[in-house]
Swiss-Prot record:
GO terms for cellular component: basolateral plasma membrane; endoplasmic reticulum membrane; plasma membrane. It comes from Homo sapiens. Plays a crucial role in the metabolism of thyroid hormones (TH) and has specific roles in TH activation and inactivation by deiodination. Catalyzes the deiodination of L-thyroxine (T4) to 3,5,3'-triiodothyronine (T3), 3,3',5'-triiodothyronine (rT3) to 3,3'-diiodothyronine (3,3'-T2) and 3',5'-diiodothyronine (3',5'-T2) to 3'-monoiodothyronine (3'-T1) via outer-ring deiodination (ORD). Catalyzes the deiodination of T4 to 3,3',5'-triiodothyronine (rT3) via inner-ring deiodination (IRD). The active site is at residue 126. Residues 34-249 are cytoplasmic. Its EC number is 1.21.99.3, 1.21.99.4. Belongs to the iodothyronine deiodinase family. This is Type I iodothyronine deiodinase. It comes from the Eukaryota. The keyword Cell wall biogenesis/degradation does not apply. Keywords: Cell membrane, Disease variant, Endoplasmic reticulum, Membrane, Oxidoreductase, Selenocysteine, Thyroid hormones biosynthesis, Transmembrane, Transmembrane helix. GO terms for biological process: amino acid metabolic process; hormone biosynthetic process; thyroid hormone catabolic process; thyroid hormone generation; thyroid hormone metabolic process. The keyword Oxidoreductase applies. The chain crosses the membrane at residues 13-33.
Length: 249
């Protein structure tokens, strides 16, 4: 991949300033108006399921907002979205991925004829991805006759050496492919009922699909049929259900 174009550098600089101001203002408001800020964060957490997640209390995650680790992760996500080129009806990137056996393959290899293929990007340290994983499994149970499903394990959302939440799974940032494969194997305990692959260490599928920290897509015959909004706030398996129901009707 070549160097970013000057226009992209300017956009990155602008996003850097936006995120920096957001974090500084957030820290100040958290000091001056702690109760109000916490209520706002809880309202956002309601969309992701964090407030209903039995594995986390408010003190496990709210104090991590506006930290240095928060800044770097949000900046990474915002920069990634600047390079999002996927669009409805457009060609779905045929990125290289790795099966849990270590065999390399491509996303398109999981398409079967004209059957839609649901792509679910996420990681074990992403609470909303894990909290809504049973919803995803119900999609497989209800629509496996007309669609195929694939989980693509990407870099950790809340690695223990990054923007970490207390009481979360203890997984460090992946230093090599073996680390990523080991982390993905932990997902098998949730009985995903579909193939699980991992992104390459170049994070190619995560970048081209702008998937961090989690995201849903449906592709059909190599084209993007559905493009879910970015997680965690807008990660919604029920939108996938609505699309599949329409296809099935």
């Amino acid at each position: 991949m070549g160097l970013p174009q000057p226009g992209l550098w300017l956009k990155r600089l602008w996003v850097l300033l936006e995120v920096a101001v957001h974090v500084v203002v957030g820290k100040v408001l958290l000091i001056l108006f702690p109760d109000r800020v916490k209520r706002n964060i809880l309202a956002m957490g309601e969309k992701t399921g964090m407030t209903r997640n039995p594995h986390f209390s408010h003190d496990n995650w709210i104090p991590t907002f506006f930290s240095t680790q928060y800044f770097w992760f949000v900046l990474k996500v915002r920069w990634q979205r600047l390079e999002d080129t996927t669009e409805l009806g457009g060609l779905a990137p045929n990125c290289p991925v790795v099966r849990l056996s270590g065999q390399r393959c491509n996303i398109w290899e999981f398409m079967q004829g004209n059957r839609p293929l649901v792509l679910n990007f996420g990681s074990c340290t992403u609470p909303s991805f894990m909290f809504k994983f049973d919803q995803f499994k119900r999609l497989i149970e209800d629509f496996s006759s007309i669609a195929d499903f694939l989980v693509i394990y990407i870099e950790e959302a809340h690695a223990s050496d990054g923007w970490a939440f207390k009481n979360n799974m203890d997984i460090r940032n992946h230093q090599n492919l073996q680390d990523r494969l080991q982390a993905a194997h932990l997902l098998l305990a949730r009985s995903p009922q579909c193939p699980v692959v991992v992104d390459t260490m170049q994070n190619q599928s995560s970048q081209l699909y702008a998937a961090l920290p989690e995201r849903l897509y449906i592709i059909q015959e190599g084209r993007i049929l559905y493009k879910g909004k970015s997680g965690p706030w807008n990660y919604n398996p029920e939108e996938v259900r609505a699309v599949l129901e329409k296809l099935h009707s």
